[in-house]
Amino acid sequence: MNKTLGYIFQILNPCVEITVSPPSWPEVISTSQNEGLSFLLYRSAIKKNIDIPFPIKQSLKQEYIYNWGRNIRILEELAALLRAFEDPVIVLKGAALLSSVYEDFGLRMLGDVDILVKPADVPKIDKILSQLGYQSDHKQDAYYVTNYLNSLVYGKNGSPLLLHLHWHLINNALPNYIYAEKINMDKLWKEAIPLKIRESDALCLAPHHQLLHLSEHAMKHSYNTLIHVWDIHQIINHGKEKLDWEMICVEAEEFQLKGPLFYSLWLSKEYFGTSVPQGILEFLRPRHKGVGEKIFSGLLRQGKRREKLCWLFYFSHISTVQKKIKFVFRTLFPPRDVLSHMEDIENGEKSFLIWKVALRRLRKALRLLGKAPQEYDD
């Protein structure tokens, strides 16, 4: 771990007293922003009375206030939509976390707002959104309700709210479709719990399901920004008395998410001192790693959280040669409907898009393999 990250983690840890100066305040701020932790850093530093240079402190304060106001506006718009929907909605990730486990609306940036609806309710909700002025680049009736392509993004002119409408918990981003069918969606809906978004009623995932979902999401992004790991830290800290670790392990096995859960919990404990029972980590710890997972694990232990690093992990967990070939092909050459969902392109470019994406992904894969460590630390 580099000194700058180490210093940031000390500031974020309420039990650690800061006794040294940072390597460089500009570097601390830049790193915290890249990791999505700058708002948390600002509030934690204020609580600890850390002497931040005045111009930097003022800049952090202004960014925090702006983010707080933006988040409130987004949540107010989401609350209005929830009142318009007659069907149950599960609010996911950032919006759910800000409304439950975070103590302050300004501590975390909201990107897309993710909501989960039942597949049968998608046409009705799509119609309501359209009537309220929200538009999607893709037509709902052109989508097959599957585990492969299972979401639509809606926006509205002049609104900061970008709504990501899901009808399955696992997003369409490759290669997550491989284990999407293992997720018991009926169980998620049955065990969802009430949530207030401002003054509107909604649902959120039960704590054990939320932990699994956040772990899967963080793995999908190869842990490239630590705010995803901090979300996991927050869920565990907030629910210390309520988390059923035995249930979490059972569901992780059933949903085939033991690997993502292990690496997410390990990173959270390693970086933020999260209270994760050692017996749980030992139960989840991979016993037989393939070459890809050994490289993945070795890079994580070196603090190298690269984009698309998760491909190595996923590749190792595919059982047959035939499925591995399919995985490589689908990763490099996604279906055209998925490509149009992933890329903002002009009509005239469509015939070249598949090759453009394939070459870009191939370069990323070669970059991963080219920089892999020679020895693996288990």
Label the model's feature ranges.
Residues M1-G111, V117-D378:
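Conserved NTP-donor binding/palm subdomain of two-metal-ion nucleotidyltransferases/polymerases, i.e.
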